[in-house]
Curated annotation (Swiss-Prot):
The cysteine framework is C-C. Disulfide bonds join 63-68. Expressed by the venom duct. Residues 23-57 form a propeptide. Keywords: D-amino acid, Disulfide bond, G-protein coupled receptor impairing toxin, Hydroxylation, Secreted, Signal, Toxin. Moderately activates human somatostatin receptors (SSTR) with a preferential activation of SSTR1 and SSTR4. In vivo, does not cause behavioral changes in mice within a few minutes of intracranial injection, but causes a progressive loss of movement thereafter. Four to five hours after injection, mice recover, even with the highest dose tested. Shows antinociception and antihyperalgesia activities in two mouse models of acute pain, most probably by acting outside the central nervous system. GO terms for cellular component: extracellular region. This is Consomatin Ma1. GO terms for molecular function: toxin activity.
Length: 74
């Protein structure tokens, strides 16, 4: 329970830190947060786990915030 609370607090700081003056605080906080907790790493680990479970790439696109990259054959 304490870990979940700490992760929630750190994610709130991660979201609000870019609002700080000049982004200096944001850079310092990023240095304190483990690279495992950053959203990009979490997304990457979820997609790699999904691909390994399916036995390879199924050709499905991952859309973030409902914005999908265009397919090369469109």
């Amino acid at each position: 329970m304490q870990t979940a609370y700490w992760v929630m607090v750190m994610m709130m700081v991660w979201i609000t830190a870019p609002l700080s003056e000049g982004g200096k605080l944001n850079g310092e906080i990023r240095g304190l947060v483990s690279h495992i907790l950053i959203p990009q790493h979490t997304l990457r680990s979820l997609t790699s786990r999904d691909r390994s479970d399916n036995g390879g790439s199924s050709g499905a696109q991952i859309c973030i915030w409902k914005v999908c990259p265009p397919s090369p054959w469109r």
